[in-house]
């Protein structure tokens, strides 16, 4: 997830064509997110929705034995056709393949490591060859396996999302698809042991971050939308925060925007390391990002860093913990330190390169001082207790309150926000009509090397 600065398993549709022979068998604000909808599109027809990818914890494999009417020759030479009418032969046989826990694939509890990279500074070169440091790192920090487990869940969930999401799906369908997959792979509902690390960000176009649908949201993904997909997975409070951007247009007009942001994020990852100054990372990211431009409708737009959005370090059960990683040169001489975990994320925009909060809020989290807050009504106190017991200090959204059985809670929720017990994170947007993109990775600063734990074949 981003931090703002100011006040698949592929879901496969298998079509098997049978003939008469049998065929073989994603100011300084903290980036949790929401924004007003740039376009409220009409929902698709019910018939279309019925054919969309299922959004529950199972994936649907559709086998379509289309028994084509074929001519066979009788012994007398006259043709005969199959007895069943063609329409009846096109029935779809739906089989549900259940997603199993990630633990079943790794029964020994040892999960794939991420991408290892050397530290950039020469003064750290001794770290790479230190066998003792690597041994002590493994002995001290067995929580690395929690990060690797979360990262493997993340890779599988995003592969499923990338292969399943299509224009015409509602944002709620997309959010359910992703979040139910996380719950299934983690073998946990929204619990404090494992599962969803923060609400799934599905911000469109000029909305850079913090949008996820609330109940009743009818917004539909369009073919010309640019969608940032920000997914969080945690295991025992160790959060993997990684994001990517999806486009669906036929003429690939957004390619340079995505290329700029992806390269900028990889630059930030490459420059990060123990004793590296945060300003130096921001300067390197800015140089790469702002070397790009893109053309839309015959007009050329420079691609700008969104200067009041940042990466951040990650704490246990805390998505934004202290340090911020700028994506422009900002003079911050703070250094990264051994053992820290960072989300390196960058945002590019064709707009102003600056975001402001707008629209209906969906993202929330307990404030650091929530225990000292003076909460007035009994209903607000009860809601606070529900939030604390279900989510702790992890971010959450209104849909999660619905899921745990809360009803008619908006008044009490607003009271908690006003009392300072809960922090709200509305959507943050650039100039109307602009386009924004995001890529993000989680990195672990081991004593000897850094591990890009969320790295995959896709980005």
Swiss-Prot record:
Keywords: Aminopeptidase, Cytoplasm, Hydrolase, Metal-binding, Protease. A divalent metal cation 1 binds at residues 230, 241, 440. One of its GO terms (biological process) is proteolysis. Residues 88-99 have a biased composition (Basic residues). GO terms for cellular component: cytoplasm. Substrate binds at residues 210, 320. Binds 2 divalent metal cations per subunit. Has a high-affinity and a low affinity metal-binding site. The true nature of the physiological cofactor is under debate. The enzyme is active with cobalt, zinc, manganese or divalent iron ions. Most likely, methionine aminopeptidases function as mononuclear Fe(2+)-metalloproteases under physiological conditions, and the catalytically relevant metal-binding site has been assigned to the histidine-containing high-affinity site. Pfam families: Peptidase_M24. A divalent metal cation 2 binds at residues 241, 312, 345, 440. Residues 63-101 are annotated as: Disordered. It comes from the Eukaryota. Its cofactor is Co(2+); Zn(2+); Mn(2+); Fe(2+). It is found in: Cytoplasm. It catalyses: Release of N-terminal amino acids, preferentially methionine, from peptides and arylamides. Its EC number is 3.4.11.18. GO terms for molecular function: initiator methionyl aminopeptidase activity; metal ion binding; metalloaminopeptidase activity. Its main location: cytoplasm. Residues 63-81 have a biased composition (Polar residues). Cotranslationally removes the N-terminal methionine from nascent proteins. The N-terminal methionine is often cleaved when the second residue in the primary sequence is small and uncharged (Met-Ala-, Cys, Gly, Pro, Ser, Thr, or Val). Belongs to the peptidase M24A family. Methionine aminopeptidase eukaryotic type 2 subfamily. PANTHER family: METHIONINE AMINOPEPTIDASE 2. This is Methionine aminopeptidase 2. It comes from Meyerozyma guilliermondii (strain ATCC 6260 / CBS 566 / DSM 6381 / JCM 1539 / NBRC 10279 / NRRL Y-324) (Yeast). The lineage of its organism: Eukaryota, Fungi, Dikarya, Ascomycota, Saccharomycotina. The gene is MAP2.
